[in-house]
């Protein structure tokens, strides 16, 4: 049977300054300079080196493999001074067979390169390309006869369910390196065996399958594949399986298991304050908990392949996922092979996840208008590749705001979504309504989604009269209030994804008074502060009873009468000022009260069993800390 040992400790890291220090994995060298602005974070080659003793294994009957789950963006791996593999693409798993190269004591060196180049994606985008070994490295010992480890970094097991007339047929294809007999069993959530089959191309059948049914009932089976040699089990792979159907209709939106299922959710970048992309499982768990609290049922995992652990969480909690490769912003004529290899790895490594319904081939690729013919051909090749490798899912892409509805790139994939910031980068929130209606009028048979929309919001910036571009928490909330009403009038949209769930690093930016950051998140970069907009979405999407008073951080006010805005998913909200009830409203999501402001007041909102409190005070002059002080900057703010 296979054994796995992590190689996470005692790495010698030689960084940009040429000095060598001791680090633990996960690690990135851009955790600080990739988040502080200036578009000057260091990109180049750094070296990681460690020693390990050869694992106990029988060379006649076993093999040893190294597994790398994320090295950004190019890796050159050396074992005992010998170059054993290279890998281009910083977000996917790769493995290398090392049995014949091991000594008693071994030196493993990984040269990691995130340099600017013309053939590996991403090269231009509104996020930081952190260099480093930021996911796990493992040493694996397996039988010489084993379930394949050398196929695009996948598990060697491909599971394809088909549902019809209330029954399920499940095809389980197993790649074997060596020889042996394959047996397959399907276990229900309680661990009971509900189906069995034999062979490397096995068929399982269920008469009454329990469906994976989104966030309300994300039921998962477990498929156990065993490889036996001479009657002895020598290898085993377990995979969670969700059984579901889905479809998309341009007039009625997304369907899950045959019924309408409105997809409303968020996009997610994986990085964190102070650690970059070198995040832990506990951080993944916290991200998922916040997304679930919001009430989202879909996640766009942008703009690259995320950690397998997070896809597992999406399976577990019923999130419908858009998965994509980092073919982004600027087409590279020399980069086609890299888009193909990254897509093959994305599909192979994630094929078995029931959460995933579509493969994203690119994002805002028309920002650069050069090499248009080659770019379109690259898209067609990717689209065809996705369909060839996976006939069970759809393809999509995210179009740049300035990519008009008639652009041919928007009509290659099965689905299309737009990144539109009307009301933020462009004046006029009302234009969102017009844009959706126009596209639907011209292309009534084309499913349309919003892959990005949002506005910057700083929890420390405030205004009683918020305006586009002021970066206040209030304008961000005002923007999202409009967008939610807009989507409610366009229920035929196949999916909408807020940009972004969390603030994230973009070292080229200098906006909102904090260089190096994109502040469109509903939650701050450190995950410690839920902005008011977070609670707005919770009011629309969540079933968890709550009430929230907005603008709590906007304490000092100059007006003699102020608005107290309240978000809640309850039908009635009562407001108290200094203990006296001043009003009660019935409605949905957003409740607004006008109250006089003299001196300091204590405000309490009550909705059912839920309460929230806030304090405000009248001041004679505006608090200068609430207003953005704009400075001249050479940083390239993304538009």
Residue ranges and their predicted role:
Residues 171-173, 288-291, 298-540, 544-560, ...:
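Substrate-binding/catalytic cleft of secreted carbohydrate-active enzymes
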Residues 1-305, 311-313, 317-321, 342-348, ...:
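Secreted/periplasmic carbohydrate-active enzymes, especially glycoside hydrolases
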